[in-house]
């Protein structure tokens, strides 16, 4: 199960998804001296997207005997990771726009570590899908030799 490289990639992807839930995506220092932050846990849809990503990655690890289903779930998970990436940047922009519309000036703002984790997620899931595909090709070639 964990002996296969794609299982390791899926486990790392689940860890990256969990880290995305733990850390802030964006922090801003406001002109009135306070700070505000956006994290995935505070937005319901973003939280659900990351939970789905984590569950699909962990579920994919245990589907090692059903490689075609594992491959499809991993591709589907990549789509969820793209959706999470796009939606988290939308949430950050909406938060910044609400602050500015509310008359609060942002003196400095920066994306945090967790905002780049969906990119790592996509890469890890792609590597896992590639490993699953190679496994499937290897099994088919061995079946032809029998």
Where is each model-derived feature located?
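Cytosolic juxtamembrane helix at the C-terminal end of the final transmembrane segment
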Residues: 126-146
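Short, aromatic-rich membrane-interface segments at the entry and exit
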Residues: 7, 70-74
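Transmembrane alpha-helical segments of multi-pass membrane proteins
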Residues: 73-86
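Interfacial loop at the N-terminal end of multi-pass membrane proteins
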Residues: 2-3, 7-56
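C-terminal TM-helix exit segments that contain a strictly Trp-centered aromatic cap at the helix terminus
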Residues: 19-24, 83-95
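Individual transmembrane alpha-helices with interfacial aromatic-anchor signatures
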Residues: 6, 43, 105-127
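Juxtamembrane helix-break-helix junctions at the cytosolic face
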Residues: 58-71
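Interfacial non-cytosolic loop connecting adjacent transmembrane helices
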Residues: 34-38, 91-114
């Amino acid at each position: 199960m964990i002996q296969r490289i794609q299982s390791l990639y899926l486990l790392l992807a689940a860890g990256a998804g969990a880290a995305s839930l733990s850390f802030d995506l964006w922090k801003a220092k406001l002109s009135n001296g306070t700070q505000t932050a956006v994290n995935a846990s505070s937005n319901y849809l973003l939280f659900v997207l990351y939970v789905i990503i984590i569950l699909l990655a962990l579920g994919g690890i245990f589907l090692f005997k059903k490689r075609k289903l594992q491959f499809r779930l991993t591709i589907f998970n990549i789509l969820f990771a793209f959706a999470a990436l796009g939606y988290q940047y939308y949430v950050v922009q909406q938060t910044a726009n609400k602050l500015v519309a509310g008359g609060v000036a942002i003196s400095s703002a920066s994306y945090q570590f967790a905002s780049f984790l969906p990119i790592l997620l996509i890469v890890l899931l792609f590597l896992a899908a590639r490993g699953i595909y190679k496994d499937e090709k290897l099994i088919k070639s061995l079946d032809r030799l029998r």
